[in-house]
């Protein structure tokens, strides 16, 4: 998973730069796909875990969000989203469709090997026996990947221990930094109002506004 560099603020209020890095060594393929889908769609963890293969439109490179996983009384449950705007369709790059197809084939082969012991319901992200991936797994996998990346690197070159939700924040920040309109970003995130997006990503909008100012300066300076 490669991510271009832009600055954002993590959940502790500490600013950091999303550098140009890779974290793929010794990682399960479905975890790689999970991380990529989180970055390229901005879906919440619960929305990702609730995805079934029927939610993927391979022809048009789209993912349909219609449910989410959460913890209720200590139990992992899948239910409808809290708001109408959480029901949405989000596009992703074509290379990711190919990765998803390969993962689907691998899981079908595993299902055949398990036979009657398979307990899955067509979930995309699964445990060994086909059951839905545990709610804690995405966070644990990301922390493990960050730790392995940081091993042997000096502090200034290390990645911060961001939560899994940080991938969603990174997705939005990169879109805003690339001058995507706030309505599009808000729709992809499933926010009820654009004001929610603007409040959460004020730091990225300020950076984007500064870049716009610099562009105007360079354009008008040529006319002076």
Q: Which residue ranges define each predicted feature?
A:
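Catalytic-site neighborhood detector that most strongly recognizes the C-terminal catalytic loop/helix
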Residues: 69-71, 97, 189-215
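Key DNA-contact positions within bacterial/archaeal DNA-binding proteins
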Residues: 46, 136, 195
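Short, basic (Lys/Arg/His-rich) helix/loop patches that form interaction surfaces
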Residues: 2-31, 41, 90, 106-116, ...
């Amino acid at each position: 998973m490669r991510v271009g560099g832009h600055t954002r603020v993590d959940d502790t209020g500490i600013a950091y730069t999303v550098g140009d890095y890779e974290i793929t060594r010794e990682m399960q393929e479905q975890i790689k796909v999970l991380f990529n889908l989180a970055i390229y769609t901005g879906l919440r963890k619960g929305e990702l875990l609730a995805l079934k293969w029927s939610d993927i439109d391979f022809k048009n490179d789209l993912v349909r969000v219609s449910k989410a996983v959460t913890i209720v009384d200590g139990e992992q449950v899948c239910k409808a989203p809290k708001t109408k705007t959480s029901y949405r369709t989000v596009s992703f790059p074509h290379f990711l469709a190919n990765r998803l197809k390969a993962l689907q084939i691998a899981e079908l082969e595993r299902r055949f090997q398990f036979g009657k012991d398979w307990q899955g319901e067509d979930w995309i992200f699964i445990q060994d026996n086909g059951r839905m991936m545990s709610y804690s797994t995405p966070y644990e996998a990301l922390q493990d990947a960050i730790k392995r990346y940081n091993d042997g690197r000096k502090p200034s070159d290390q990645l911060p221990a961001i939560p899994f939700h940080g991938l969603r924040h990174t997705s939005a920040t990169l879109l805003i930094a690339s001058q995507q309109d706030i309505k599009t970003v808000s729709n992809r995130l499933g926010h009820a109002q654009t004001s929610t997006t603007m409040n959460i990503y004020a730091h990225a909008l300020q950076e984007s506004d500064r870049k716009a100012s610099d562009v105007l300066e360079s354009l008008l300076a040529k006319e002076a």
